[in-house]
């Protein structure tokens, strides 16, 4: 996988697809059970690295998970100072690195506050500042806005844009399609441990076609309806929900609604969205 400098790349896919596992493996936090080579930023992580080279490699890569990696009783600045020491950042460079990271993440005015006193949104921005303090070329963000309200999430989006503008490459995992549309240059769709698609957000959306039909089908008719759509029209269908009484079905590739009308089905017709491609790649029948 090659990522361009300054790209923001989304890693999306169903729960259990392997997104967090992939991020933790290529960041060196986990060791794969089956691999003969794992080269990231020029270093094979399956081979022991000399201590000096290991420190240098670690400084090139940042990782911020959706769970806090911070020490609550330390101040924001003290948390970043700790990371500088841990990763061997030269003492003469620490103050500049810390100040730059806090400015990028818009937390400089809270540098003296203990982390436990901060809101969830602020903690996440400090978490990203922590990952940035070694001045990495590449940063991994694992669901960076999980659990945040829209205003706090928007603050994190501002941080990601500033990282991109400063030349940092960002790989983020997310379930939020608006994040993918608004922030990302490229999308990787992961399913069952494999990359199933690699495209821009718009190119990926186009896989769902121009129009999607959303059907409400009685559960007793589910199989016959899907069979007719697939066999007679070559449609692709995805079952979104089945409550035992009625099934919510997405139908892709229909040129018109004639057959739906003939079958007396209840449906809505709308323009395809990126989320529809997610359903198509992650749950096609």
Predicted regions and their residues:
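Helix-to-loop junction immediately C-terminal to a conserved catalytic motif
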Residues: 27
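Conserved ABC transporter NBD signature motif
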Residues: 35-48, 57
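ABC transporter nucleotide-binding domain
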Residues: 157-248
């Amino acid at each position: 996988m090659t990522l361009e400098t300054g790209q923001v790349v989304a890693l999306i896919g169903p729960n259990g697809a392997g997104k967090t596992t992939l991020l933790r493996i290529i960041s060196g936090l986990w060791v794969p059970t089956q691999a003969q080579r794992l080269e990231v930023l020029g270093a094979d992580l399956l081979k022991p690295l000399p201590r000096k080279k290991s420190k240098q490699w670690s400084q090139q890569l940042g990782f911020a998970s959706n769970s806090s990696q911070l020490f609550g009783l330390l101040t924001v600045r003290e948390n970043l100072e700790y990371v500088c020491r841990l990763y061997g950042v030269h003492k003469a460079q620490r103050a500049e690195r810390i100040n730059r990271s806090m400015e990028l993440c818009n937390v400089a005015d809270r540098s003296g506050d203990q982390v436990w006193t901060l809101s969830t949104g602020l903690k996440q921005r400090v978490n990203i500042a922590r990952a940035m303090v070694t001045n990495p070329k590449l940063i991994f963000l694992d669901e960076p806005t999980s659990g945040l309200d829209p205003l706090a999430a928007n603050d994190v989006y501002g941080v990601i844009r500033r990282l991109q503008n400063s030349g940092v490459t960002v790989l983020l995992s997310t379930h939020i399609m608006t994040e993918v549309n608004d922030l990302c240059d490229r999308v990787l769709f992961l399913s069952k441990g494999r990359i199933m698609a690699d495209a821009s957000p718009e190119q990926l959306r186009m896989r769902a076609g121009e129009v999607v039909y959303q059907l409400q089908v009685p559960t007793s008719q589910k199989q016959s309806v899907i069979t007719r759509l697939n066999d007679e029209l070559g449609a692709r269908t995805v079952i979104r929900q089945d409550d035992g009484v009625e099934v919510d079905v997405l139908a892709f590739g229909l040129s018109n609604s004639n057959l739906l009308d003939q079958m007396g089905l209840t449906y809505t017709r709308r323009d395809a969205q990126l989320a529809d491609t997610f359903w198509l790649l992650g749950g096609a029948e």
